[in-house]
Amino acid sequence: MIDEKNQAKIEHAVREILSAVGEDPDRPGLVETPARVARMYAEVFATKTAAPFDNYKLFKVEHPTEMVLLKDIPFYSMCEHHLLPFFGTVQVAYVPQHEQVIGLSKIPRLIDYCSQQPNVQERLTVSIATELQRILDPAGIAVSITARHMCMEMRGVSKPGVHTESSYYSGQFKTDLDLKREFLQRIAK
């Protein structure tokens, strides 16, 4: 959580930005905006002040499946270049080993943890896989992200609706082309 000193710094900076773009930060519609933005940053950048992700439980499974797949997990993050949102869906698959699996709800929580900081999509993709590898040590991981970036839609090239895709594969997903193909076919449905 952002402490009071840094909260005040953010509020001051937002007032300065509003003034610099020709707004009156004391007018009725904007007077509370600096505090709102500071609270919003505390929320969307929560990982920067959080402890390492440890909100998970592993379960022993005598006969684990070949692949565990979670599809269409929504996420949002903030582009580190423009501090504008990017958002979309994540597909995560892993091949269990050591007869253990992770609680299913923990993967979306892990995605939230990795995305709540200034980011680029490519690093977010790898971060999700790296954290899952650290926690679970599976035989392979596949992560695919499809996202829309407001820094491309609202400014610069101004192309609404463009989707950016990124992926990361490790272990069996990298060496077993049939497994990788199965992952890609299943996420395409």
UniProtKB/Swiss-Prot annotation:
UniProt KW Nucleotide-binding keyword: yes
InterPro entries: GTP-CH-I_C/QueF (IPR043133), GTP-CH-I_N (IPR043134), GTP_CycHdrlase_I (IPR001474), GTP_CycHdrlase_I_CS (IPR018234), GTP_CycHdrlase_I_dom (IPR020602)
Keyword Transmembrane: no
Gene3D superfamilies in the record: 1.10.286.10, 3.30.1130.10
Name by which UniProt lists this protein: GTP cyclohydrolase 1
Keywords: GTP-binding, Hydrolase, Metal-binding, Nucleotide-binding, One-carbon metabolism, Zinc
Protein's GO biological process: one-carbon metabolic process; tetrahydrobiopterin biosynthetic process; tetrahydrofolate biosynthetic process
HAMAP family from the UniProt entry: FolE (MF_00223)
EC number: 3.5.4.16
Catalytic activity as recorded in UniProt: GTP + H2O = 7,8-dihydroneopterin 3'-triphosphate + formate + H(+)
Gene Ontology cellular component annotations, sorted alphabetically: cytoplasm
The gene coding this protein: folE
Pathway in which the depicted protein is active: Cofactor biosynthesis; 7,8-dihydroneopterin triphosphate biosynthesis; 7,8-dihydroneopterin triphosphate from GTP: step 1/1
Positions that bind Zn(2+): 79, 82, 151
Family: Belongs to the GTP cyclohydrolase I family.
Superkingdom: Bacteria
Quaternary structure and interacting proteins, as annotated: Toroid-shaped homodecamer, composed of two pentamers of five dimers.
Record GO terms (molecular function): GTP binding; GTP cyclohydrolase I activity; zinc ion binding
Pfam families, A to Z: GTP_cyclohydroI (PF01227)
